[in-house]
Regions:
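Predominantly soluble domains enriched in secretory-pathway, periplasmic, or organellar proteins
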Residues: 1-210
C-alpha cells in the first residue's frame, strides 16, 4: 500500500499489504490498516506507525470489501465467494460473527453513527442493510430499471450522506446510480451516468457526487 503526501502528490513510503490487496480501511485513529487479500483468503492488519504487519486473519474465499466502524471497535470484511460479512474485533483480532448476504458481496459502508452496515452484492443484485448490534439483516434493497436487463444491475459502490437521509448506489453495467431513502430503504430515483459505474465519493460539502 503506497502512502501519498496530499500536498506534494508524491509517494512518501510503502506499507506492507499481504498478497493481492483489494480494499483496505483505516481505524479512526489512523494507527491500523485492515487490508483484504483476495488470493490468500486473509485480512492483513498493518501497524501504520511502525509500518509492519500486526497479524493476518483467516476469512472466507475471495475477500474484497473492507470497513471499520466509526468507533473503531469492529472491522468488517466481505468474501465474494463465501458470501459472508466477517465481523472482526479490532482489539482481539478475532472473527466474532459471520453474516450471510447475497451473492458476491463487494463493498460495505457503515452509517455515520455506526448502527447500520450497508453491503452491496454484485451478482445478487441487492444491497443488504444489517443491524450492527444484532448483526442480522433488517432490509434488502432490490433495483429495477425500466429497459435494463436484470443481469446488468450489479450494485457495488455505496455512499451515505452524513445526515443519514440518503444512500447512493453505483449499479455497474446498468449505467445508473440509485438514490435510496436511508430511513425507509426505498429507491427514490435512478440517475443515468456513464458506463460501468462502480465506486462513488462525495465532494467535502456533499453537494456533488463523483
Amino acid at each position: 500500500v503506497q502512502v501519498l503526501d496530499l500536498k506534494t502528490k508524491k509517494i512518501i513510503y510503502n506499507l506492507p499489504s499481504g498478497e493481492d490487496p483489494e480494499q483496505f480501511a483505516l481505524t479512526p485513529d489512523g494507527k491500523e490498516l485492515y487490508v483484504s487479500n483476495e488470493d490468500d483468503a486473509i485480512v492483513t492488519v498493518v501497524d501504520t506507525v511502525n509500518r509492519s504487519v500486526v497479524t493476518q486473519i483467516e476469512v472466507g474465499v475471495e475477500p474484497e470489501g473492507m470497513a471499520v466502524s466509526p468507533d473503531g471497535t469492529v472491522a468488517i470484511n466481505t468474501t465474494e465467494t463465501s458470501n459472508f460479512l466477517h465481523w472482526i474485533d479490532t482489539k482481539t483480532k478475532k472473527i466474532i460473527h459471520n453474516t450471510l448476504v447475497d451473492q458476491r458481496p463487494r463493498h460495505i459502508e457503515f452509517s455515520k453513527t455506526g448502527d447500520k452496515v450497508w453491503a452491496s452484492s454484485e451478482i445478487g443484485g441487492t444491497v443488504m442493510v444489517v443491524d450492527s448490534t444484532s448483526k442480522e439483516s433488517i432490509a434488502k434493497i432490490k433495483f429495477e430499471i425500466p429497459g435494463v436487463f436484470k443481469d446488468l444491475i450489479q450494485p457495488v459502490g455505496i455512499k451515505l450522506t452524513s445526515d443519514g437521509k440518503y444512500a447512493f448506489v453505483g449499479l455497474g453495467p446498468a449505467n445508473h446510480v440509485a438514490v435510496v431513502d436511508a430511513k425507509t430503504f426505498k429507491v427514490i430515483k435512478y440517475l443515468l451516468v456513464g458506463q460501468r459505474v462502480w465506486m462513488l465519493d462525495f465532494a467535502q460539502n456533499e453537494k456533488k457526487l463523483y
